[in-house]
């Protein structure tokens, strides 16, 4: 990624060993782990030092390996439903441009369900999360992706590590969305945090 440089990186696994490392078709580093006797628990630890640049959530100028139009396809978790159409219609009111619409769409999605830890699983669809009116970060992300794609905006699921500014030690994995805008690039949105 052009806004970060990896200075040091190390990955370890409690119940196995890393046997192969390669770059996938999207340009991501993949590490394969071999586990001889799986005991039901697996702890993977990655640590490193990165040098980053603040780009205000906009990723521009990357040499993409995948055309953004590929991120218009529905998945089982992001198939649009009637509630996605309602979210879209609400977000379409009074927008001057596509960026303003994307921000409004993010806000409407942010207000569409309540964040309730443990209320869903990794297989919960955007439709199901909207139906029960609660979910976690991945559900907010799936809903925003569904709504963006419904409006012909390429959108992709991003996950990473959320660094809490309170230094409480409660840092965790997190999911958010990037929406592609022509002539600008990918813009990050975090609907579960209304950002």
Walk through the language-model features, giving the residues of each.
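Short intrinsically disordered coil segments
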Residues: 9-11, 59-69, 191-194
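Generic structural "secondary-structure junction" signal
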Residues: 13-15, 28, 35-37, 52, ...
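Short, conserved charged micro-motifs
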Residues: 57-58, 187
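Hydrophobic/aromatic-rich core segments of domains that either
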Residues: 139-195
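Residue-level signal for pocket-adjacent positions within structured domains
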Residues: 21, 25-30, 67, 125, ...
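A broad, low-specificity signal for short, low-complexity segments enriched in glycine/proline
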Residues: 2-11, 116-118, 136-141, 149, ...
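Intrinsically disordered, low-complexity N-terminal segments that are enriched in acidic
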Residues: 1-55
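Secondary-structure boundary elements
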Residues: 45, 50-54, 60, 66-135, ...
